């Protein structure tokens, strides 16, 4: 008994066992001592228990199979668990837990080594990527979106600004005879902190000095004061990540509401700045297609096609550190309650679900097909054919098509 107890105690190390309710801990321990689960089986049981609690579903005690053979128990338990994953989520009776009601974080400046200009962190030959360059003026984000990978890379309570950012921008050498697409919303939100530490001053001046750079600000905020009070260079794009009210309320904590994001985009567009919209992630849940359709229709009715440069679609894609961090948190989320399939080394929806959500989204925007650039983000090549009826042969072909379209929309010269 003591020997197996030692094995059990070793197995629960570096797991979320101690974060489970006390009665659940005692139940798992009792069943393990009785059935002699293996090291890996104990870890699986702990993760299942934690996920069910995070999803606000039944406790593992309620669904645990009553059988004296551990193989049968594990088979039935995993089957029951996968059934919870496979069914479309319902947020109707979902209760949030320990969600922050206000943004609380510390600001600091640091002289970062090197410079934050690099390739998009998810760029891959396995997926069709646009070769976006990223410019990290700020590290970490004040929003608390449950699915976001930023939380796995940075300290969420500390927002770090590069004290040498302005000088590094001035010293950046780019080919004046080439068009670049640089995004600023990868390691943080582009607009939520406004012009703190002179970040927007520096970026706007960089855009003015480099008219061959298409500079994209991506946000979930409505903090557009700087855009409204200043002249905006015509090579700047301002884009919003949008979702349904259901997902915003339950998974995009502290971010601006859908109404506020759309109103902010309207104000910016009316000033003559080209805008765009990212539906990433599209999330499957009960009646999700009809709820997303309402958002798509609203954009079609409130914006004209010549105000919008781009619309992108993407969905949930998880790396292991993010899943681990979600399990470590004392909160509730249904964001991982989905059928997992391998997607180029990450976990995502099966292709059948992706095809449904992407094709529905694209067809909903039919009036804009000829005037707005549509694309998929982080998706494998064959999904393009299933969604749009066409694909690009290479990432470079995709990049050229995107830059050409953006340049035309912005009325700037496109240079290969």
Ranges and model annotations:
Residues 188-191, 222-225, 237-255, 281-286, ...:
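Conserved radical SAM core fold
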Residues 261-322, 364-376:
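Conserved C-terminal portion of the radical SAM core fold
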């Amino acid at each position: 008994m003591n020997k197996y107890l030692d094995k059990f105690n070793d197995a629960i190390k570096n797991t979320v066992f101690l974060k489970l309710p006390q009665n659940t801990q005692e139940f798992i321990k009792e069943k393990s001592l009785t059935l002699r689960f293996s090291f890996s089986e104990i870890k699986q049981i702990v993760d299942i228990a934690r996920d069910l609690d995070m999803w606000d579903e039944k406790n593992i005690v309620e669904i645990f199979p009553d059988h004296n053979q551990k193989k049968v128990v594990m088979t039935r338990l995993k089957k029951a668990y996968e059934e919870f994953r496979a069914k479309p989520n319902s947020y109707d009776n979902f209760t949030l837990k320990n969600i922050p009601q206000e943004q609380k974080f510390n600001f600091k400046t640091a002289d970062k080594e090197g410079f934050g200009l690099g390739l998009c962190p998810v760029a891959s030959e396995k997926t069709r990527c646009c070769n976006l360059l990223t410019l990290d003026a700020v590290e970490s984000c004040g929003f608390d979106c449950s699915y976001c990978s930023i939380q796995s890379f940075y300290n969420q309570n500390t927002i770090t600004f590069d004290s040498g950012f302005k000088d590094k921008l001035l010293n950046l050498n780019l080919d004046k005879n080439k068009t670049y697409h640089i995004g600023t919303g990868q390691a943080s939100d582009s607009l939520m902190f406004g012009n703190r530490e002179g970040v927007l001053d520096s970026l706007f001046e960089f855009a003015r000095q480099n008219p061959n750079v298409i500079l994209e600000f991506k946000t979930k905020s409505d903090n557009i004061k700087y855009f409204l009070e200043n002249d905006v260079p015509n090579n700047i794009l301002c884009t919003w990540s949008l979702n349904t009210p259901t997902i915003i309320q339950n998974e995009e904590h502290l971010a601006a509401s859908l109404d506020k994001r759309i109103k902010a985009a309207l104000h910016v567009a009316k000033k003559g700045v080209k805008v765009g919209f990212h539906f990433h992630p599209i999330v499957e849940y009960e009646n999700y297609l009809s709820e997303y359709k309402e958002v798509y229709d609203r954009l079609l009715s409130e914006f004209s096609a010549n105000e919008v440069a781009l619309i992108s679609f993407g969905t949930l894609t998880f790396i292991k550190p993010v899943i681990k961090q979600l399990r470590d948190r004392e909160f509730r989320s249904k964001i991982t309650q989905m059928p997992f399939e391998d997607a180029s080394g990450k976990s995502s929806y099966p292709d059948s679900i992706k095809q449904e959500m992407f094709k529905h989204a694209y067809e909903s925007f039919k009036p804009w097909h000829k005037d707005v650039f549509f694309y998929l983000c982080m998706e494998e090549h064959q999904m393009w054919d299933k969604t749009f009826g066409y694909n690009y042969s290479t990432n470079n072909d995709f990049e050229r098509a995107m830059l050409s379209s953006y340049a035309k929309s912005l009325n700037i010269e496109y240079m290969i």
